[in-house]
Every structure is written in C-alpha cells, then in structure tokens.
C-alpha cells in the first residue's frame, strides 16, 4: 500500500466517485425495470378504463370513475417520467401515494401487521412498486437522467 500523500488523498474521492457511479447505475436500473412495468400497467388501464372502473366500484372506492382515471394516468405518465428521469421526484410523489393507497385497499391487514408478519407485507404485488417509488423519491434519479442533464446545463449557463 502506498503512503504517497497524493495517492492517499485521491483514494477516498475516487472511491466516493465509484460509489456515486454505482448508485446512479442502480437508480437507472430501478427506474427502467419497475417504472417501465408501471407505465405499461397504466397504459393498459387507460386503453381499457372500464376494467379499473368496475374493479374500483366492486371494492367500494368512492368516485370510481375519477379514481380510475387518476390512478391510470398516475401509473402511465408518472411511470414514463420516472423512466426518463424527468421531474423524477415530483412524479414519484403521486406514484408513492397511489401505491400506498393500493396497498391499503388491497391488503390493509398486511400493512397493519408489517412488524408481526413482514413476509406478507413484502410479498404483496404493490410492494416492489411502492419500494421503488420511495427509493426514487428519497434518492432522486441519479446521474443518468434528464433531470441531471438539465441540471448540468443550467448550472453551466448560470456560471457563464
């Protein structure tokens, strides 16, 4: 191991840079994998809106027509915005709320017993989308996103 001060001082920053690269890569993979699926689910709901309206009516959800449109649009447009990394955190807010409500409506027992029966909580169909939305909401889209590209462009212009 080198004790050269230049090497020692450079190592933490290069390790941190590698960590940021890995973080951004993981965020990109999460965005593409989960939110492309969510986009397709939302698009299918928009193409056949009668199905979610009927499902929401059967569940006793108030204003099933309005809620079906809101959920379908949130999943479709929120999903594609998050995949692109455009207005990512803003898009993640309604997606997170929608997944939380879906979780509660589909299986409130799993939500209430998260500590007693965590296997039931994490095996619910809503869990991966809810977790992915929380991750993107908390950590942002990473370097590989339109948000990051626009951020770099605007910073560069403001420095000129």
Q: Predicted regions span which residues?
A:
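Extended, low-polarity transmembrane helix blocks
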Residues: 1-47, 65-73, 77-80, 84-160
């Amino acid at each position: 191991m080198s004790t050269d001060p230049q090497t020692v001082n450079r190592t933490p920053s290069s390790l941190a840079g590698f960590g940021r690269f890995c973080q951004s890569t993981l965020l990109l993979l999460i965005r593409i994998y989960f939110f492309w699926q969510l986009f397709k689910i939302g698009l299918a709901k928009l193409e056949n809106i009668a199905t979610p309206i009927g499902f929401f009516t059967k569940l006793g959800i108030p204003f099933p027509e309005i809620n079906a449109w809101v959920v379908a649009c949130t999943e479709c447009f929120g999903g594609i915005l998050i995949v692109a990394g455009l207005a990512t955190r803003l898009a993640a807010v309604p997606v997170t709320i929608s997944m939380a409500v879906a979780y509660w409506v589909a299986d409130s027992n799993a939500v209430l017993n998260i500590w007693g029966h965590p296997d039931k909580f994490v095996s619910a169909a809503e869990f991966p989308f809810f977790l992915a939305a929380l991750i993107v909401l908390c950590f942002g889209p990473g370097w590989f996103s339109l948000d990051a590209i626009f951020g770099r462009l605007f910073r560069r212009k403001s420095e000129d």
